[in-house]
Amino acid sequence: MFAKEVYIARRARLLSDMVAAGEKGIVLFLGNAEAPAQYKDNCYKWRQDSSWLYFFGLDEPLYGAVLDLESGEQTLFADDVEIGDIIWMGPQPTVLSRAESVGIRRAVPYGELDTVVAKALRAGRPVHFLPPSRYYNTLKLAALTGGAKPSEALVRAVIAQRLVKEDCEIAAIDAACDLGYEMHTVARDAIRTGIVEQEIVGKMEGLTLSKGWGVSFPTILTQHGETLHNHLHDKIIEPGKLMVIDAGAESNEHYASDFTRTYPTGGRYTPRQRDIYQIVCDCNNFAFSQIRPGVAYRDVHLATVRLMLERLKDLDLVRGDVDAMVAEGIGGLFMPHGLGHNMGLDVHDMEDLGENLVGYDPDQKRASQLGLGSLRMARKLVPGHVITDEPGIYFIPALMQKFKDEGLDKGFVHFAKLETYSDFGGIRLEDDVLVTADGARRLGRQRLPIEPDEVEAAMTRL
């Protein structure tokens, strides 16, 4: 948790922005409740709601809060533990002491939330709340508000605030990236033919647990990189394969890191693997060189796809005018995802609030084209944005066949050559990037080895 002044300032700005936008009424926040796996005493791993963490910092279940836009009054709703709870949990701080730790002076029992919201509704006052991501809060909000819809004004205000990271947030993300570096180093050093992929996943995730942290999302580790988010780890590691590892750590403050590297299972890339790997590596470096304030990340995506197609043309996998290929969406055959996404308290930051609202400026319209349509972050960049830079090239047999059968290639794809890559898999390379006043910097103290010679040197030292 940060100093209480951080949370006081965040809530003050939110209230100020909402009032400046002409909004009235109350702002209602709900923290998460525990989610039972089978029964109420055996729950899924606890994770607090990210917007709750941002404005209140309290990392325990069943909290609520109301901010009054007219009076400025702030109230925390939660229940103090009783003797039955103390027997199982031990002594706990009072709700009031927890409220005071984040700069709130008034704390009342959780049950009074119903009364406060009902009173506001009877008086005709708007009740602003965010879209819930958990079933308990969905049901609770429906009961409290009579099925009212989330407040778009509040959603936009929260997005505007959370998109630009404060110094304390950047420090937390840097720390998460440092542990992410260690995770990937442990994984790279553990790659051996003949072992099961899960052994490597266990070492990576065990490292985060040994630090008292956790992972920022389920680890992706696979020799089938053509499946973009393959969470199965049951394969024996074979020689001559490419292993995609997409993983990150979550800091004690719940900020994420998200790195991807692609390793040769035998320690050296084959000539064909190196050709494709170098293209992806160059695209990653090129994209980073384009990141700076005032540039739309959509334009960086398109420029990176153009470079990728130029290089694939050099390998005779595509033929024709590269600009026409970009316009026709041929890049989506090889990279059917966007260049990157926002990152912060969520690894895909704030997507529970609406992916288009988070990733697109009001004057930007999301494309329907394969690849570009999956771009999660298209906005014009400003200092304080934290984004990922993650180009990839994938040879997906089913997608290749679809392009061929339906003529989606528009005559640009050299299928006779492309089909020789059907067993290739995929390559993705991802760094986490902070937009600065005059450009960008990669987050974390050091960058994971990425150039093919660097990767091979690191693997052959073992």
Where are these predicted regions, by residue range?
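Active-site neighborhoods and metal-handling regions in enzymes and metal-associated proteins
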Residues: 1-462
